[in-house]
Swiss-Prot record:
Protein known as: tRNA (guanine-N(7)-)-methyltransferase
GO MF term set: tRNA (guanine(46)-N7)-methyltransferase activity; tRNA binding
Organism the protein comes from: Drosophila persimilis (Fruit fly)
S-adenosyl-L-methionine keyword on record: yes
Coiled-coil regions, chain positions: none
């Protein structure tokens, strides 16, 4: 079994060429039931989170401002860390082996970049964001939230499990500051239409028009920075983008 290792230990299951962990040692089912009773440790309130355990170099005046919900294997999270070195980004992932991989990947990147300070601004939490998001973030804390290629839950009976729904949108609005942005990307048109419908119906969001969405410097990175996005590109699949502003 692969476990997370401290930064000063040698990583197992690591490529001799890249020095990074290899995904084949961290395989897991593509999706996890978010309604099931997983065993999670979670804080009672945001003030109880020990962020320094995840970000050893974080300054007293810094806090998490970007959240990649369902970050998968961390490709986009790493890109965020590179694009915004002064911002603190967190990836949240429910699957244990996948979150272990992201943690080990970040540890390896920090070791390879030792002395530069790179990748000290990203981290990953294994948690269920559909249940515990307000336990980690105070009201209006986040600037940006990302929902990239979420589980479409195709069966109608499972639509209630979708990461975008009316109840959860109110929770996202609570932790998102006014003017903050929600980025969504999927290769499933039905899910895209579901997202747009629910976001449009919620009084605390407005959709960015096409021009504003396409001029956002993050937009080009949404297509293939994540492993799932890169797979869609390889398979010549469709991408459906929608970005919303918190009112």
């Amino acid at each position: 079994m692969v476990t997370t290792t401290p930064e000063n230990e040698v990583l197992t299951s690591t490529s001799a060429v890249t020095g990074l962990p290899q995904k084949r040692y961290y395989r897991q089912r593509a999706h996890s039931n978010p309604i099931a009773d997983h065993c999670f440790d979670y804080p009672a309130r945001p003030e109880d989170v020990d962020w320094r355990s995840l970000y050893p170099s974080i300054r007293a005046d810094q806090e998490v401002s970007f959240a990649d919900i369902g970050c998968g294997y961390g490709g986009f999270l790493v890109t965020l860390g590179e694009l915004f070195p002064e911002k603190i980004s967190i990836g949240m992932e429910i699957r244990v082996k996948v979150s272990d991989y992201v943690l080990d990947r970040i540890t390896a990147l920090r070791q390879k970049s030792s002395g530069t300070g790179a990748y000290q601004n990203i981290a990953c939490l294994r948690t269920n964001a559909m249940k515990y998001l307000p336990n980690y973030f105070r009201k209006g804390q986040l600037e940006k939230m990302f929902f990239l290629y979420p589980d479409p839950h195709f069966k109608r009976a499972k639509h209630k499990w979708r990461i975008i729904n009316q109840a959860l949108l109110s929770e996202y609005a609570y932790v998102l500051r006014k003017g903050g942005l929600v980025y969504t990307m999927t290769d499933v048109e039905d899910l895209h239409n579901w997202i747009v419908t629910h976001m449009d119906e919620h009084p605390l969001y407005e959709r960015l028009d096409e021009e504003e969405a396409n001029t956002d410097p993050i937009t080009p990175k949404l297509y293939q920075s994540s492993e799932e996005g890169a797979k869609v590109v390889r398979n010549k699949g469709d991408h459906f983008l929608a970005i919303f502003r918190r009112l």
